[in-house]
A protein has these predicted regions:
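Long, positively charged amphipathic alpha-helical accessory segments at protein N-termini or as interdomain linkers
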Residues: 1-116
Length: 116
């Protein structure tokens, strides 16, 4: 069995550094927590229903189209070395595939660091 958790910064407005934001910062005003929860659950239900109907390829395309910094070169720390890389996609195992000067790199969770 597995437990999956999702954390959302809803109405927080101040963050140390630039690594995080909140829905309130994006929208420009605070959100009602119950309404936010209802919209989030509705979105999950919609995607789950589509997955049950076999719409996995389209869901995956939508997911990839929203990846942060997709197809844009950005500095990363890979195996301790700072180097530019370009996010290509996420594979079927959840690994991030990056293009570097020396070739493609496959990285699992906590194996690379996105540098700001």
């Amino acid at each position: 069995s597995s437990i999956i958790g999702i954390g959302l910064n809803v109405n927080q407005s101040d963050f140390e550094g630039i690594r995080a934001t909140s829905l309130a910062n994006i929208k420009g005003s605070n959100l009602g927590l119950i309404d936010c929860l209802a919209e989030t659950l509705e979105a999950f239900d919609n995607i789950y229903g589509r997955a049950q109907k076999g719409d996995l390829d389209e869901i995956q395309k939508e997911y990839h189209s929203r990846l942060f910094r997709l197809n844009k070169e950005h500095p990363f720390r890979i195996k301790g070395d700072k180097q530019p890389a370009t996010i290509q996609h996420v594979d079927e195992h959840g690994n991030l595939i990056l293009r570097t000067a020396s070739g493609n790199v496959t990285a699992g969770i906590k194996e690379i660091e996105f540098l700001f």
